[in-house]
């Protein structure tokens, strides 16, 4: 029998090894989209990620016969546990060679950590919050990954489902939606009608709106409100919101962000937002081992600012429930579709959606949606 050793990440050098393992394991894979090393370091560093206000975590490396063979993060989100009445330890950032002794040892380490912390079950793959990738790919292994989601080899779910005690906790789907030659008549008519009937209006943003006008704050307050009932969601803290505004919003193309406001008695109430961006999938694949230097930055800049891609990622779409029924999503897409056409975008990637979320999936109907990926989250009771 081979010797499997589990080592806890103790310092920055270990953390670098933890991050770099993914690049090594997926080198040459034509579908994996590696995250930027700097983003991974910021997310996993306990002194940098604002989620550690209410999360705690340990990271583990697995060695087989002295050679690095796997990694996993064990995460406890105390805010989510409190909100949902759970005592769960999450596993995330899980990667391993095709060896069932290795995958078992990694998940045993997560279970042991959870047991020591008084947790009652193991769930995952999940990150610290819903802003992190979640769900193990179980179908669609021949589809290009995206920056906001996990790509994994087909043997991963086989390993998890073969382990004693693990069962499926949730199922997710993702869709490819096509950019039409013209705004669908359905969207155009509804958009015109609700503008007049409900006084809903499109608002485009500037950097000044985001950083000085308070719109960045309003956007994430809205996201908290519209996502609050989703599986495992924990509301973003003020520190997280500040971090997201500073780190990400300012770098996006504001033409691809659409806000919807209700105008009443001089008040402009934000009721919906769509944050989309040119896909960085091909650009990130050109960043050697997730590094922006020496030439990775050029490919990322070309994608974001010069739109050198035909794919758009629909990162965050949030509309208050009472306005979804009024057709506010039609107003959103009636504004975004002409921008996609102008930039040469041919299709878009939705993000991870619960398989049971018919309301979200229904909004893609006029855009020829094709379900092309499936994911699962797993759960095991700690004994």
Feature roles, as predicted:
Residues 1-31:
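Generic start-of-chain signal for non-secretory N-termini
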Residues 3-4, 150-230:
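Acyltransferase donor/substrate-recognition loop-hinge adjacent to the catalytic core
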Residues 12-14, 38, 42-46, 53-62, ...:
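Catalytic cores of nucleotide-enabled group-transfer and carboxylate-activating enzymes in metabolic
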Residues 22-60, 64, 72-82, 210-317:
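A conserved beta-strand-loop-helix scaffold within acyl/acetyltransferase catalytic domains
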Residues 83-165, 288-366:
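Acyl-donor binding region in acyl/amide transferases
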Residues 123, 176, 259, 275, ...:
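Short beta-strand segments
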Residues 177-180, 379-383:
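Short beta-strand-to-coil "C-cap" segments at the C-terminal boundary of structured domains/repeats
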Residues 366-377:
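A structural motif corresponding to the C-terminal lobe/cap of the Radical SAM core domain
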């Amino acid at each position: 029998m081979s010797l499997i050793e589990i080592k806890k990440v103790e310092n920055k050098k270990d953390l670098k090894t933890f991050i770099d393992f993914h690049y090594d394991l997926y080198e040459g894979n034509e579908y994996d989209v590696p995250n930027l090393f700097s983003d991974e370091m910021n997310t996993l560093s306990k002194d940098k990620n604002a989620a550690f206000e209410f999360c705690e975590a340990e990271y583990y490396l697995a060695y087989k016969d002295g050679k690095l063979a796997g990694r996993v993060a064990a995460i406890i989100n105390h805010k989510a546990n409190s909100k949902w009445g759970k005592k769960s330890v999450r596993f995330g950032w899980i990667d391993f060679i095709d060896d069932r002794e290795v995958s078992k040892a990694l998940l045993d380490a997560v279970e042991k950590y959870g047991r020591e912390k008084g947790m009652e079950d193991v769930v995952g793959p999940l990150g610290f919050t819903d802003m992190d990738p979640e769900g193990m790919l179980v179908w669609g292994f021949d589809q290009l990954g995206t920056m906001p989601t996990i790509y994994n080899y087909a043997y991963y779910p086989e390993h998890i489902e073969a382990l004693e005690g693990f069962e499926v906790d949730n199922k997710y789907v993702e869709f490819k939606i096509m950019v039409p030659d013209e705004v669908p008549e359905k969207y155009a008519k509804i958009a015109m009608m609700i503008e007049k009937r409900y006084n809903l209006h499109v608002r485009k943003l500037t950097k000044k709106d985001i950083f000085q006008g308070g719109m960045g704050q309003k956007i994430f307050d809205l996201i908290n409100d519209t996502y609050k009932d989703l599986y495992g969601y924990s509301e973003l803290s003020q520190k997280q919101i500040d971090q997201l505004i500073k780190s990400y919003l300012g770098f996006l193309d504001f033409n691809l962000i659409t806000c919807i406001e209700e105008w009443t008695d001089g008040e402009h109430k934000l009721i919906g937002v769509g944050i989309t961006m040119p896909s960085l999938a091909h650009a990130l694949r050109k960043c050697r081992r997730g590094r922006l230097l020496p030439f990775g930055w050029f490919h990322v800049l070309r994608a974001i600012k010069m739109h050198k891609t035909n794919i758009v990622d629909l990162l965050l779409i949030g509309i208050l429930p009472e306005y979804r029924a009024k057709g506010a999503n039609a107003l959103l897409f009636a504004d975004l579709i002409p921008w996609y056409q102008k930039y040469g975008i041919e299709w878009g990637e939705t993000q991870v959606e619960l398989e049971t979320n018919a309301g979200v999936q229904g909004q893609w109907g006029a855009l020829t949606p094709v379900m092309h990926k499936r994911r699962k989250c797993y759960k095991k009771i700690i004994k």
